[in-house]
Amino acid sequence: MPGQGLARGHSRTLIYFPIAHTLADMGALKESVARATLEKVGRAGLARKTAAIDQIWTEIEAAIDALPLSFDRVRLYQDGLPVCGREAEIVIELAQTGSRNHQLLLRLMAQGAVLMGTEEGDLLVQEYQLARQSLTTRAPRAAGVAATRRALSQALLQRRDQFIAQRINETLKSGETGILFLGMLHALERHLHPDVKVIYPLHRSR
């Protein structure tokens, strides 16, 4: 039967899309990120990067359209979306700024998929503060300072992965399919329960 869904029996399926963030996804950091990218790669480099990310989203959209999904049994998990009760409002706001990621979420929600708060708010605040510090201060000259900053960033990423995986473990029900949009640096697979079958429609760049 068409649209039967990917999760059958007592299994749970997670469709995992490693994503690249656009400037529209950056919120208050948008201008700082654009400025830092311009300084690093120039206007031509920024244009190439923007086009490459745009192509990634075109491929993600096409991959989802090709999947045999029953959207009334689909849950959406999103990088950077806190468990807060305002999840839909946040997605709408970012979609209106031009985020293809969040525009896609709205389209899937309109088809019946359920949007899930995915991240722990305090961890996202720490991530934002660390990113802002990195973007607004000069690169540390001392190797030790740079190493400490990298270690903090990596530890925070691991804590976020653990929370996201726990959220999926607890909310994705038997017979359901989850769609996860998560930045390419993340690696939460080892934190997922063994009955969650992970599928990568696009190449997992690891």
How would you label these PLM feature ranges?
Residues M1-R206:
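Compositional signal for N-terminal targeting/processing segments
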